[in-house]
């Protein structure tokens, strides 16, 4: 009695507290009443704008006295004492827990608890005689004024709430043996179903017998616990009573109560296994026969359980989450229905709710919220229109784990969620509010441009607009604002192709009038592509803004072609021109690679791709605009034969998202292994460094490393050039010394004529014609000068080909003769056929940059032609003066075969496939080549003689040719002298300059194979370019990579062939007695540091800590390879103990692998 009187006093105190209007003052924390965040509905109207902004950041919070875990909503009017009759609130909250069940009466805006009712403190015939018995409320379900509570002891309590807020215990149902997990009403408050942990679903008829169920359902004979069950209201139209349930076995079961016989059913009508593990929750869609299920497998499945899709076994949609799903619920209202104006309703503004015939549209019209299992403090809201990114996330500042939630119904049909956390707090969240800091919106923080990598080292980047994701264009065609923006975009597009500004204005006005857009001129200007760049976002402007539209110059109109969407016309159309576009079709796409560009085109790789077309239908008798980009069109007045009504296709200007996949050709494992194995790191016997570079160029070309191949060839030619020039300079120095020693005095004019004749190579190519006699010394000087000119021309060809836009075998419209390049690199011609040598060099020197500079001013046409051929003639050594051994001829044949097999874009090598076979000798290879189709021009004696006489009369000084303008520009005159240009090697195309540039670029690009090979080959030759630290760093990193890729033979080769001082350091770092074992599964180094730090267990390298797998057993004894034994890997991949393999191969004299793979091991 004392407790009852104390409770009455507290109720009177709270009643008086409410009467005198002090609800706005904060209540004491000791009081069990609610803590209200907003005083009343009237006082909230008097708040200022700043206070209103702060009030949105506060929410309704109620602190319960005991543990609560169940939540429900009672949707019936309750008369509160101080509210006027007929205006009572109709949405209230019900929370329950251990010996706790409260009804929280809320005000109309659900921002305040007006009254709380303890439903357990009622007198009834069903009340237990032991009031201190613990009974926990596990689930709550309400309908009208009835509250059903599923208890943890297996009973079901039914409460009735009167219009005056008085609760009574109406019935108690007890037939379950374990906890009741789910309750649902069937059409009325007289029939309910309940699912229990005992694996049964029971149907109760409160009118017949309140103590015994009328129907029992089980999924199978075994007791499969039921986590949730729900009645399907959509099956009533087919005269069925359908019940869905989910179980711990991961099954979704469908029962039809009207198809069973008797009062028990032990097998469902349909059963689907959608989850891999227990399913903890389900909820049926408010409009369609779809159900959402969530379980421990971190998935939310949306499944169509209708009769027409009963044979389907896979879900319609799957949402992958980061945790186990405890509860999943559909929203109560449409995503674009209700809410305050100006609030961020997420993507709801994009969806239309006018048509519910489409199931997909019905699914996206409702949001889906889920709660996670393992003490997670968040509630995540998804929408199937964008199921991979959460729409909103409720993440409380207190970070208290949420135990239950539900979608709350309200008068304004807003998106609100009620939650219960493990701090025993009831909290309300308004998802339509932009001022709640506990509600996160990932889409607002998501950048419009993103990129991602795949497993093949390729990446893709996406550019999209947030508000255009999967927008339904067909449903938007009925929207007046959408048509307005589309017409404005079409007007802006046609503006770029019209003849003048006046014409553009006329077309825009005509199209605007056809769309009835006179009242929306400002909207058209805002959405046009021709607006100021400042008014547009930077990311959008980067691929939609056309800078050419800013100029007022007259641009040509596009050529219109019939049948392809554009009509033929020869002149720019005027404003009143009439063009029939009744046969308009979208223009086909061009099959073009992303790397190919068109010069002068406005589009680029990052531009907007071709947009898809969509149909806009006009009413009969209404005129429509012209096709985008074409003046006039169907429905335009004045067009002969143009239809007034019908269908028109408009191209949308921007469609989102834009995906650009990019394939990167680097990090190719097979190419890396091939280059590491085939690259020559030392010069073979009988070859030179230039030959080694050419061989490496062929290796790089085979794997598609065309840039590296070209660099190797450039280095080879530059190296040969430098070697030849040094030899020529040495011979000239020797000749000068001999001349000074013998005191040979000749007239200055004779010396000048002699030097000019040697430099310009004016001597006739016919050995039978001798115009000027030379000594043997002079002939050697002529040969050296010829070599200088020939190699310089080769180098010019290399530079021009390397800097050109194309690296194909076609160079300036001419083919390259492979024999000319072979002869220019020191491979002699056998024979005295001067015409054949001249003809073979005609092609290889035709594109030389020195041709225009070699012809002397004032020469005749014949002299110019002769001068070109004479200067570009290669170094041709007669067979009588060339003395080669058999070994050198063998190397020549090998190099000849390499050159003939080289790539089409090789510099100076043959590319014809018909001559790619290995010839027995250079003579056989040359004989296999076809003769030149154009006959050679005969050499005339009078031209040659006149040229020589002219050179005799010149007064040139006997010195090297004057430097070109390119040499002066590329060379620093302050540090070098013009007389020794060919001696110091400081030109931009000198060997060391090219080597330095190639190393710097390759190192910046991470081409470790190239820089390491270069470092080994040219370390001794270019110590001033390749330092010791650079060489050691490159080779050390290269050896590390080779060992990581299990290329131990190649790694050892690099250490052995490294320079001496670098090799000593590498051998100390990578000693020969170091054994590194790699996992046979994940290919990672077996360090097993985790196991080494553990004190228990057996440590070894016969298992892997990274992938947690044991290594391969011995192929002979099938035991783990551990202990003090040696594991020997065979060619086939098997491994075994040293003793076992010794017994198999040595004692038993076997040659095949003991694993049965028949791979010969011992040969």
Curated annotation (Swiss-Prot):
Residues 28-41 have a biased composition (Low complexity). GO terms for molecular function: zinc ion binding. It comes from the Eukaryota. The gene is RTC1. It comes from Lodderomyces elongisporus (strain ATCC 11503 / CBS 2605 / JCM 1781 / NBRC 1676 / NRRL YB-4239). Residues 24-52, 525-606, 833-881 are annotated as: Disordered. A zinc finger (RING-type) spans 1114-1157. InterPro entries: WD40/YVTN_repeat-like_dom_sf, WD40_repeat_CS, WD40_repeat_dom_sf, WD40_rpt, WDR24, WDR59_RTC1-like_RING_Znf, Znf_RING. This is Restriction of telomere capping protein 1. Residues 539-556, 571-585, 593-606, 868-880 have a biased composition (Polar residues). It holds the Pfam family zf-RING_16.
């Amino acid at each position: 009695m004392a407790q009852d009187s104390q409770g009455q006093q507290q109720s009177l105190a709270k009643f008086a507290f409410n009467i005198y209007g002090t609800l706005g003052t904060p209540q004491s924390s000791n009081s069990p009443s609610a803590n209200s965040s907003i005083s009343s509905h009237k006082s909230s109207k008097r708040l200022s704008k700043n206070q209103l902004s702060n009030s949105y950041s506060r929410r309704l919070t109620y602190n319960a006295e005991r543990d609560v875990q169940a939540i429900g909503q009672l949707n019936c009017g309750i008369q509160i004492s101080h509210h006027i009759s007929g205006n009572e609130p109709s949405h209230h909250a019900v929370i329950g827990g251990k010996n706790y069940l409260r009804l929280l009466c809320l005000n109309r805006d659900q921002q305040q608890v007006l009254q709380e009712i303890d439903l357990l403190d009622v007198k009834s015939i069903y009340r237990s005689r032991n009031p201190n018995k613990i009974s926990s409320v596990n689930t709550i379900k309400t309908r009208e004024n009835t509250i059903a509570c599923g208890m943890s002891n297996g009973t079901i309590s039914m409460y009735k709430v009167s219009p005056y807020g008085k609760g009574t215990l109406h019935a108690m149902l007890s037939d379950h043996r374990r906890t009741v997990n789910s309750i649902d009403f069937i059409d009325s408050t007289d029939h309910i179903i309940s699912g229990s942990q005992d694996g049964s679903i029971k149907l109760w008829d409160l009118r017949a017998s309140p103590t015994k169920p009328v129907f029992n359902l089980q999924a199978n004979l075994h007791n499969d616990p039921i986590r949730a069950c729900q009645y399907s209201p959509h099956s009533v139209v087919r005269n069925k009573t359908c019940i869905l349930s989910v179980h711990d076995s991961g099954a979704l079961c469908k029962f039809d109560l009207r198809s069973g016989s008797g009062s028990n059913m032990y097998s469902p009508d349909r059963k689907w296994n959608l989850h891999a593990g227990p399913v903890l929750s389900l909820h049926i869609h408010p409009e369609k026969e779809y159900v959402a299920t969530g379980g421990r497998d971190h998935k939310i499945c949306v499944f169509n359980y209708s009769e027409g899709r009963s044979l389907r076994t896979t879900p319609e949609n799957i949402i992958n989450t980061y945790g186990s799903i405890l509860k999943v619920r559909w929203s109560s209202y449409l995503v674009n229905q209700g809410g305050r104006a100006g609030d961020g309703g997420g993507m709801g503004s994009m969806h239309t709710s006018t048509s519910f015939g489409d199931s997909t549209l019905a699914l996206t019209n409702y949001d889906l919220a889920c709660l996670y299992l393992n003490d997670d403090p968040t509630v995540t809201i998804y929408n199937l229109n964008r199921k991979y990114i959460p729409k909103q996330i409720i993440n409380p500042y207190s970070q208290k784990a949420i135990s239950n939630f539900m979608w709350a119904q309200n008068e304004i049909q807003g998106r609100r969620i009620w939650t219960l956390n493990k701090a025993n707090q009831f909290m309300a969240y308004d998802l339509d509010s932009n001022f709640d800091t506990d509600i996160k919106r990932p889409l607002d923080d998501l950048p419009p441009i993103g990129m991602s990598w795949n497993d093949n080292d390729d990446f893709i980047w996406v550019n999209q607009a947030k508000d255009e994701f999967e927008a339904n264009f067909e449903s938007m065609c009925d929207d007046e604002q959408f048509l307005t923006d589309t017409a404005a975009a079409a007007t802006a597009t046609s503006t770029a192709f019209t003849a003048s500004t006046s014409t553009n204005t006329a077309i825009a006005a005509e199209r605007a009038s056809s769309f009835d857009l006179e009242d929306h001129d400002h909207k058209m200007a805002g959405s046009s592509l021709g607006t100021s760049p400042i008014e547009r976002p930077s990311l959008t402007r980067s691929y939609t803004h056309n800078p050419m539209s800013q100029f007022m110059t007259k641009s040509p109109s596009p050529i219109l072609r019939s049948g392809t969407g554009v009509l033929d016309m020869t002149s720019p159309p005027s404003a009143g021109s009439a063009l029939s576009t009744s046969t308009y079709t979208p223009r086909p796409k061009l099959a073009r690679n992303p790397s190919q560009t068109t010069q002068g085109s406005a589009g680029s790789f990052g531009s907007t791709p071709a947009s898809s077309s969509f149909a806009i239908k006009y009413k009969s008798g209404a005129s429509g605009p012209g096709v985008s980009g074409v003046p006039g069109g169907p429905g335009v007045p004045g067009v002969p034969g143009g239809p007034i009504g019908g269908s028109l296709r408009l191209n949308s200007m921007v469609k989102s998202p834009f995906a650009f996949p990019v394939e990167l050709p680097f990090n190719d494992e097979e190419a890396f292994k091939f280059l590491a194995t085939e690259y020559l790191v030392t010069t073979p016997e009988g070859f030179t460094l230039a030959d080694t570079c050419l061989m490496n160029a062929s290796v790089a070309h085979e794997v598609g490393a065309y840039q590296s191949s070209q660099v190797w060839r450039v280095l080879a030619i530059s190296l040969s050039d430098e070697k030849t020039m040094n030899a020529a300079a040495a011979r000239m120095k020797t000749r000068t010394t001999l001349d000074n020693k013998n005191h040979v005095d000749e007239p200055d004019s004779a010396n000048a004529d002699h030097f000019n004749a040697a430099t310009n190579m004016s001597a006739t190519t016919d050995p039978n014609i001798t115009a000027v006699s030379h000594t043997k010394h002079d002939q050697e000087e002529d040969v050296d000068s010829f070599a200088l000119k020939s190699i310089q021309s080769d180098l010019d060809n290399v530079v021009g080909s390397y800097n050109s836009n194309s690296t194909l075998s076609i160079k300036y419209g001419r083919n390259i003769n492979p024999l000319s390049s072979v002869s220019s690199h020191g491979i002699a011609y056998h024979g005295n056929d001067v015409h054949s040598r001249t003809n073979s060099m005609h092609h290889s020197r035709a594109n030389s940059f020195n041709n225009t500079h070699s012809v002397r001013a004032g020469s005749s046409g014949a002299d110019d032609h002769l001068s070109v051929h004479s200067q570009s003639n290669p170094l041709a050594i007669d067979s009588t003066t060339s003395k080669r051994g058999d070994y050198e001829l063998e190397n020549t044949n090998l190099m000849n075969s390499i050159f003939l097999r080289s790539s089409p874009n090789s510099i100076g090598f043959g590319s014809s496939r018909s001559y790619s076979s290995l010839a027995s000798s250079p003579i056989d290879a040359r004989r296999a080549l076809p003769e030149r189709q154009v006959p050679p021009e005969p050499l005339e004696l009078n031209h040659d003689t006149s040229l020589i006489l002219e050179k005799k009369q010149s007064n040139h000084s006997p010195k090297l040719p004057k430097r070109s303008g390119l040499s002066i520009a590329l060379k620093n005159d302050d540090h070098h002298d013009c007389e020794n240009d060919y001696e110091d090697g400081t030109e931009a195309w000198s060997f060391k300059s090219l080597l330095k540039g190639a190393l710097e670029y390759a190192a910046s690009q991470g081409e470790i194979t190239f820089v390491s090979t270069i470092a080994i080959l040219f370390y001794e030759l270019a110590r001033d370019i390749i330092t010791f630290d650079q060489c050691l760093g490159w080779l050390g990193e290269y050896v590390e990579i080779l060992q990581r890729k299990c290329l131990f033979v190649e790694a050892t080769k690099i250490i052995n062939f490294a320079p001496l001082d670098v090799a000593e350091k590498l051998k100390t770092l990578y000693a020969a007695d170091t054994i590194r074992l790699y996992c046979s599964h994940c290919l990672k180094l077996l360090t097993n540091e985790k196991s080494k730090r553990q004190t228990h267990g057996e440590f070894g390298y016969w298992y892997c800590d990274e992938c947690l797998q044991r290594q391969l057993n011995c192929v002979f004894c099938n035991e783990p390879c551990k202990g003090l034994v040696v594991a020997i890997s065979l060619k086939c991949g098997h491994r075994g103990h040293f003793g076992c393999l010794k017994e198999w191969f040595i004692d038993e004299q076997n040659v095949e692998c003991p694993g049965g793979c028949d791979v010969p091991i011992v040969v």
